[in-house]
Every structure is written in structure tokens, then in C-alpha cells.
């Protein structure tokens, strides 16, 4: 399955006030919606793909039609203006809207709970009735809920059929927490790209490790204010693979090609029905041959498989409702029947950055001396001095690094392009003023802790070697699991730089205890088994790093 080059899709985004002002019976044309910024772009998702399937809407034909319409539009615009050409341009735009706009799917932004209660009774847009479909976790934070057409213009009972498919024929006798179930079901609305089905899937229990460590215990059960107590030798339980799974290099290679990635992906964020998490590339078949000396494994339902017939391993923390199905075959068959597919929301890079900007939270708890501060700000000050000194190449790098979504993106991009074409523009008054504005912003940001440092943001995964020891039931004691010891992490980027210690931060931070100094380690064994993971932090399963980083997990 090749990565789909889908055209831009759009949906209506209405406010609850607007719908209620129209007495829950809105009449609006697409052009009016566009003019009022009520027609918004929407990334492709499983839910949108299902809507197209239910409507018997063929995307390949639609893509060809869109290409033809765009080409015709270009050709007409080259011709002299005329009434006929103007009329045809309008017809082309209408035809493109019919393809792009998904009128079965409407998002509503709520002003109040009362509005929410009222609109959940139903409302109409252009004569079509809509019912509440789902609230995604991110959408709920922004008071936004997704509604679906009850019966659409194609006479399809969309709400009923889409709701049925999203439930994926799960065992409805299983008790669920409503809020969690809503979040699990909403995974179908994540922006994603479909990929091919793996050749063999294994679902296993999470790896739960127990050890003793020093902790700070907070208890607010019996008092108005929390009581803090330090415990030196506390019992700690850690899920080392919370939201994490494994894929064979063969599967990673195939998915990399399907996602048009020009390297072997080390990790990606995966979706399917009630399934979410990060899968990392690890040759668990080789592990079976060389370490476990075994090729049979047992899944969470008690079924036995040959590991050489498995390409993807999911954990129970990834497949949220695994116990609502009788086996992996039962789950996959129901996914096929309801048009669920595996899809990828993000492919992680194979190289990490050399430099990043600090967040003020990361340094606010430090008691820094003047000498420490001078050392910390040195890279930022040097960069500003280089630009003020007129260094052409460093000015270009500075400007590219200063461009983000909050700073005149398109205009600054044009300035950079102009400088690349004509370096002498560095002496132009307008360019000089523009650079000075950027420098002033850089200085203001530096004052609140946005400082350039050697570092990067990096995804974390639990030790896949330890997970495989668990999968193959090797009987290894908790304190011997994995290749990493307490206080250690593996990171190829820092190993290649011969760095032996890093400081780990994760926003948002609440106290200095959220900061951890970790050893960067390596060995021939680690280099071999972690060879497909060049740009991730591999965590040990013997310390409280995840707890210290505000409950960090691996998905």
C-alpha cells in the first residue's frame, strides 16, 4: 500500500452561538462558510476514510478528477477574460468543493455547557440533521466536539453506520470507563496515513518490573495540605513498555517505503482500532535464535505462535481493548470488516539535532553563579555577536533559526531567499532593520531562558532487549533484565559524540526533582541489538526516571 497523496479536505467548523442564533437550523453555502472562516482544512484520518467508503466515494477517481480540474483552471486563467471563462471557473471551484468538502463531518466549538446540552439534542445544517459523534482529547481541551450527519445527501444513515464501525464489534459486555473509552474510540480521528498489514502480529502483556529506590512520597488523603515524606528503600513498580511495541526490520523497511521515508524508520507512532503507541525497530526473531534459543511465544490470550511468523509485537497498553476480543485473529477480522487499517501518525527521524533552545522551566530551579550564567549564555551571545559583525553565512543561519510560526513567517522567508540570491542586500536598510528586529526578539527571549544549548528533543522507549526477555519467558529476575543498569540510558547520537552524561528534562516541570542526570553507555552488545534505533533514548528498567519526568511513558 503506497502512501496516499490525498488532496486537501475541508469540513465545517461552527460555533454553538452561531447554530443557536440560527435556531438550530443553519443554512450556509460553502462560499459563505469560506468567507466567514467556517470552512477549515482537515488532515486525513481513519474516520474520514470510513466516511468515504460508506458513501462509496472512490478516492483514486477523485484524485484524478482534482488533477484535471486544477489543470483546466490553470489553462483558463491564461486565456483572455470573458463571461464564459468566468462561468467555467465558478463551475470548477464548485466541482472541487464537492470533492474536498466532507459535509457529513462537522466540528462545533462550544461557549458553555448549556449550549452543549442543547445541541446534543440535534441540529440541522442545510437541511441535514447532525448528532454528536465523538470528542477527541485535544478537541475537548478546546471545547470542540465532532458531529455527524444522521442521514446524508446520498441517503446513507451515516451516524448509525459510522458509530457501528468505530465500535469495531467489540464485546460490549465488558465494563469500561466512559471517558477512557471515548478517548480510545477517538483514536480513529487522529491524522494518519494507512499502511499495509504486518505479516503476523503478537499481543503480549506489558513488562512490569519491581525494584527498590529512594522516593519522595506525597499524601493528601487525610490533610488539607499534602504531607511529604522521603522513603529510602521504597517498593517501586514500573511498566517499562507503557504504550510501546516492537517491529521487525523487514516491516520497518516496508512501512518506510510506503511512507516515502528515505531511511529505515527506527520508530513510528501507530494507530488502529483502539490501538495507539510507538513501535520501535528491533530484530526479535534474531533474539529468539541467538539469546532465547527458542522460536515459540505465547500471546495474551494463551495462544502459541512461531516468532518467525511475526512482524509486529503489540503490548496490552497499546491495544487498549484487547480483552474485548477472543484472539488477535478475531480482532483483525473485525478490523477488516469495519475498514480499520494500521496507520501511522508520525515517523520519528533517524538523526537528532545538535542544538536546541532551552525552556525557562528547565533552568529556573538552579542556583547559578555568575560564572555559570556566563557559560550558559555564551552560545547565544556568540551567535548574536556574529550576526552584528556582518557574517553573511551566520546571518543566514540565524534568520532561518529565527523563523517560526509566531514570527512573520512568509515575509521573513522572502527576506532569506532574497539574501541567498543577492548577498549584497545585507547592506540594505530594510534588511538591516529586519535583522535588528530579529536580534531584539532573540535578546528578549534569552532574558526569559530561551537559550541555545547542545541538546535535542528525543523520543523515549523502554529497553527492547528486556521486553524480549519477557516475551520469550526466559525467567530472568527483575534486577537482571535488559542491557542497561539503573542510572543509564543508551543514545547513539551522544555515544557518537563521546558524551558520557546528559541531563534529562521534560516539560511541564513542577520542581527540581524532575531533572535527572543520566549516564550515556555503550557496548558491543548494545550496538548490535540497538542498531536500528539511531535516534531514540533507550531507558533502563531499574530506576525512577519515568516517575521523575512527571509520569513519562513510551507512547
How would you name each of these model-derived features?
Residues 1-552:
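Conserved small-residue
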Amino acid at each position: 500500500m503506497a502512501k496516499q497523496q490525498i488532496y486537501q479536505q475541508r469540513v465545517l467548523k461552527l460555533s454553538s452561538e452561531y447554530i443557536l442564533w440560527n435556531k438550530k437550523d443553519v443554512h450556509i453555502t460553502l462560499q459563505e462558510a469560506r468567507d466567514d472562516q467556517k470552512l477549515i482544512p482537515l488532515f486525513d484520518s481513519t474516520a474520514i476514510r470510513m466516511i468515504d467508503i460508506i458513501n462509496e466515494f472512490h478516492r483514486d477517481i477523485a484524485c484524478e478528477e482534482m488533477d484535471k480540474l486544477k489543470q483546466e483552471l490553470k489553462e483558463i486563467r491564461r486565456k483572455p477574460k470573458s463571461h464564459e471563462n468566468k462561468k467555467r471557473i465558478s463551475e470548477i471551484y464548485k466541482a472541487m468543493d464537492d470533492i474536498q468538502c466532507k459535509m457529513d463531518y462537522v466540528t462545533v466549538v462550544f461557549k458553555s455547557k448549556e449550549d452543549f446540552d442543547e445541541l446534543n439534542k440535534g441540529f440541522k445544517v442545510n437541511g441535514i440533521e447532525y448528532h454528536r459523534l465523538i470528542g477527541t482529547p485535544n478537541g475537548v481541551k478546546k471545547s470542540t466536539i465532532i458531529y455527524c450527519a444522521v442521514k446524508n445527501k446520498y441517503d446513507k444513515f451515516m451516524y448509525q453506520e459510522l458509530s457501528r464501525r468505530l465500535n469495531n464489534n467489540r464485546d460490549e459486555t465488558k465494563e469500561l470507563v466512559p471517558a477512557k473509552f471515548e478517548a480510545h474510540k477517538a483514536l480513529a480521528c487522529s491524522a494518519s496515513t494507512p499502511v499495509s498489514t504486518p505479516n503476523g502480529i503478537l499481543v503480549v502483556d506489558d513488562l512490569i518490573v519491581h525494584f527498590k529506590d529512594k522516593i519522595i512520597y506525597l499524601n493528601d488523603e487525610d490533610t488539607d495540605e499534602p504531607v511529604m515524606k522521603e522513603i529510602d528503600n521504597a517498593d517501586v513498580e514500573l511498566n517499562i513498555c507503557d504504550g510501546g511495541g516492537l517491529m521487525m526490520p523487514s516491516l520497518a523497511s516496508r512501512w518506510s517505503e510506503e511512507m516515502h521515508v528515505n531511511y529505515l524508520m527506527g520508530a513510528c507512532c501507530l494507530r488502529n482500532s483502539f490501538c495507539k503507541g510507538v513501535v520501535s525497530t528491533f530484530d526479535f526473531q534474531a533474539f529468539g535464535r541467538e539469546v532465547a534459543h527458542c522460536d515459540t511465544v505465547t500471546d495474551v490470550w494463551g495462544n502459541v505462535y512461531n516468532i518467525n511468523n511475526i512482524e509486529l509485537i503489540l503490548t496490552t497498553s497499546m491495544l487498549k481493548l484487547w480483552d474485548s476480543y477472543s484472539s488477535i485473529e478475531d480482532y483483525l477480522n473485525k478490523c477488516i470488516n469495519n475498514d480499520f487499517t494500521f496507520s501511522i501518525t508520525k515517523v520519528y527521524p533517524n538523526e537528532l539535532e545538535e542544538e536546541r533552545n532551552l525552556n525557562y522551566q528547565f533552568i529556573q530551579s538552579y542556583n547559578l553563579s555568575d560564572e555559570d550564567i556566563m557559560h550558559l549564555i555564551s552560545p547565544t551571545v556568540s551567535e548574536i555577536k556574529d550576526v552584528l559583525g556582518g557574517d553573511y553565512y551566520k546571518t543566514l543561519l540565524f534568520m532561518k533559526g529565527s523563523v517560526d510560526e509566531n514570527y512573520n513567517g512568509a515575509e521573513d522567508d522572502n527576506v532569506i531567499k532574497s539574501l541567498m540570491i543577492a548577498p549584497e542586500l545585507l547592506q540594505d536598510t530594510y534588511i538591516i532593520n529586519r535583522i535588528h528586529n530579529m536580534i531584539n526578539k532573540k535578546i528578549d527571549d534569552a532574558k526569559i531562558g530561551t537559550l541555545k544549548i547542545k541538546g535535542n528533543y528525543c523520543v523515549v522507549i523502554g529497553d527492547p532487549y528486556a521486553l524480549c526477555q519477557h516475551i520469550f519467558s526466559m525467567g530472568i529476575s527483575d534486577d537482571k533484565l535488559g542491557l542497561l543498569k539503573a542510572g543509564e540510558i543508551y543514545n547513539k547520537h551522544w555515544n557518537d559524540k563521546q558524551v558520557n552524561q546528559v541531563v534529562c528534562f521534560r516539560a511541564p516541570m513542577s520542581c527540581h526533582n524532575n531533572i535527572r542526570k543520566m549516564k550515556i553507555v555503550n557496548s558491543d552488545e548494545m550496538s548490535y541489538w540497538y542498531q536500528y534505533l539511531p535516534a531514540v533514548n533507550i531507558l533502563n528498567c531499574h530506576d525512577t526516571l519515568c516517575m521523575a519526568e512527571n509520569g513519562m511513558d513510551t507512547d
